[in-house]
Amino acid sequence: QPGTPRPTGHMMVYPGVHYLLFSLLDACGLDDPDRKMVVVRLLHAVWSLVIVRTGYRIALRLSADPRIAWRTGLFLALFFFMPFLSVRNLVEMVSAPFLMLSAWWLLKGVPEVGSSGEQAAPPTATAKCLLLAGIFAGLAINIRFQTVFFAGGAGLALLLRREWKGAVLFGSAVLLPLIVLQGTIDLFIWGKPFVEMIEYVRYNLDNPDN
């Protein structure tokens, strides 16, 4: 930036991870840009497989039919735009595995409805599931700020179910990665936490047509 640097409204966790990765590759003697990007593409490809595995598990839990779950995983793996976009440097795709993991743990924390219509106890402790779901949702927000609406929707659903404790646990878990990662990074760069998030909101309020 010319002149005095100022916040631009970008979450810095994802660029920061790339900075550390490129520094590591430089230290290992890999300084060719094309080879560096091959490494980046491979890491993104491996990370995108979380979507396939988690999508399979979500479909299996919702349908109780292995065939439906298998087809769901197959579509997630092969549907034309998924493999193409998953290896790109797109925060929309990089945050997707975190959202899928959050959805999975939310499902695990909600009692299942059996064939008799009675709710069975959740397979694992609800508190643990909600905490993990919140942490993964918070990590997704660290990558792409707009995913805050996913976390907001999940929190609202818990409130509508009158699960007050669960909503507090989930909300607290969402805030934890934001405070530790984005808050710390902004504090280090700008001397105040959450500067980039505030700038993002301010810019969009001032430029609603962009």
What spans do the regions from the language model cover?
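Membrane-interface transmembrane helices that cradle and orient dolichyl/undecaprenyl
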Residues: S63, S102-L130
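Short hydrophobic/aromatic helix or loop-helix immediately within or flanking a transmembrane segment
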Residues: T4-D31, M93
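Short acidic/glycine- and proline-prone juxtamembrane loop motifs at membrane-interface regions
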Residues: F84-V94
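Hydrophobic core segments of transmembrane alpha-helices in multi-pass, intramembrane catalytic enzymes
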Residues: S48, L76, S95-A103, L132, ...
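Transmembrane alpha-helical segments of multipass membrane enzymes and assembly factors
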Residues: L30-D31, I51-A69, K108-P111
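Membrane-lumen/periplasm interface segments of specific transmembrane helices
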Residues: A140, V148-N210
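Transmembrane-helix motifs of polytopic, lipid-linked glycan transferases
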Residues: V38-S63, L101
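Short helix- or helix-capping micro-motifs
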Residues: A69-F80, A137, I141
